[in-house]
A protein has these predicted regions:
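Divalent metal-dependent catalytic cores for phosphoryl transfer on phosphate-bearing substrates
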Residues: 1-99
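Terminal helices and disordered tails flanking the catalytic cores of nucleotide-processing hydrolases
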Residues: 71-154
Length: 154
């Protein structure tokens, strides 16, 4: 969860404030300058507005963070007051991110309850994230595949 530590300051620009906070923490832990640079660079480049897989660690972080969609992320218990983000997350009853045995494809496999949210709603919210996942996978010399309800979409 270190990558989102900047959210304690504000959601806006949390990647940059988080990178600064992580620098202090890692420096106080006597991490090597090379490790600190790699980690804070990944943290500073993981948010949608500024994300870019500048190194393999950043690419892995982007894949993990942007593919994190699941019902348990929704804290609001009143389904009648859900916004589209709540609906999309709540609709995901199963989520799995995996790499094939040949290490050529990273696949995000989702099961979505279409009574709660349509696949189109998912794309309305997460298309940008899926594009970032594809770029991150490419940085790791992988192809990104998205499968929703058994249908390969990317």
């Amino acid at each position: 969860y270190l990558h989102d530590i900047g959210n304690i300051v504000n959601r806006v620009d949390h990647a940059q404030s988080g990178a600064v906070m992580a620098f202090r923490i890692l420096d106080n832990m006597d991490a090597s300058p090379q490790d600190i640079a790699t980690i804070i660079t990944a943290i500073g480049n993981h948010d949608e507005g500024t994300a870019y897989p500048v190194n393999p660690i950043a690419a892995a972080l982007i894949l993990a963070d942007k593919s994190d969609v699941r019902r348990s992320r929704v804290r609001n218990n009143d389904i009648t007051t859900f916004d589209i983000h709540d609906r999309v997350n709540y609709s995901v009853v199963k989520s799995r991110l995996s790499i094939n045995e040949e290490h050529t494809v990273v696949e995000l496999c989702l099961s979505i309850d279409t009574e709660v949210c349509s696949v189109m709603d998912y794309f309305e919210i997460f298309l940008g994230r899926m594009i970032l996942c594809r770029k991150a996978a490419q940085r790791l010399d992988l192809k990104f595949r998205l499968v929703i309800n058994g249908q390969q979409l990317l």
